[in-house]
């Protein structure tokens, strides 16, 4: 399911999985970024550092035989509970990164496995030994902005983004305590699911349209719900898909065609993530208004190279929010459809759903749905 959803890598987050998981990733060619068990905040004394380094090096020894594993992550969001970054202070300024266990842990892992890159502190964007980003704009930070606020921003490599949408009512009823707790928002489950779709689609396409400029990759959090009361997956705990899966299937395939927009249409891009060129292809777009009248359209031939990002069209800003527009995009070759994408009422960009909580509990690691 992971590979069929267009992903070629994943992140094992703050745990060690079953041996068969790593064997399957080897066979399927799915790359793995692998965390330690360090999450948010732990003691900074030397005794803890020595014990933790010993534990993580055992993990490295156990897993480094797997060719799918391409990166170690020493700590996840260090200082998350003790440091609020400001323009003058970075997450990397926390004690975990500067004092303990970060410096010794990073050095030990680099020495223990010099064949792979090592991230010292995931989410320490400006740290030269880290650099990856986490972005929950419009999600965990839903009360403070909109997911489209990412427009115009760049990230070198994103290793966390996503949105938590509860599963369908029938599945929630399988866990009565969870079902009872969510009573106040049951009528909003469909709109919350739709919001997951819109947010994921916008984020994925945002990253893909900055391929190597500067973005080198992204990791959606999570693929499946790890327990009945956490909802970040695009599959629920019982294995049923949510609306977010549709966004992944539309926007996450190796060959894609995408529209850059916010308040107006900006440009159309083609992306080829394969290591071979597609050659000469026919690309096209059609923009219609709410009556179905064609407002703009074009078709042309273009050569699409291997592992590439290609700008296909620029727009002049005359098509903007305030009216309903539907957009269809496609890539064809010799009569075969290679990729397509659609945006129904393209400027409809829903707000964070009322009733969906904005409070995140760092004790439980999930949102608090008040009874």
Labelled PLM ranges:
Residues 17-20, 41-42, 78-82, 126-128, ...:
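Flexible loop/turn segments at secondary-structure boundaries
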